[in-house]
């Protein structure tokens, strides 16, 4: 699965978790993103830019790292107000 598709799936899961907590992506304060290969950052950015709420872009850091779960190329952690 491409990084673009993986990122879209992760962002959909973030939407779901935030909704369960009574929040949404406009209340994200900070996001940390990990990629197994920074050469795929364009795909990740395409998904991110299409998802993030205009006027509510949180602080964000993206780094290259080996991920704990094999088979995944992107991991995203967000902190949001509820």
Where are the regions that the model predicts?
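Short, polar/acidic, helix-capping and beta-turn segments at strand->helix junctions
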Residues: 1-82
């Amino acid at each position: 699965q491409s990084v673009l598709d993986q990122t879209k799936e992760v962002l959909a899961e973030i939407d779901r978790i935030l909704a369960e907590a009574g929040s949404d992506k406009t209340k994200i304060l900070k996001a940390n993103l990990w990629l197994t290969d920074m050469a795929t950052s364009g795909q990740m950015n395409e998904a991110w830019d299409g998802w993030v709420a205009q006027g509510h872009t949180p602080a964000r850091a993206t780094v290259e790292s080996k991920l704990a779960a094999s088979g995944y190329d992107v991991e995203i952690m967000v902190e949001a107000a509820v």
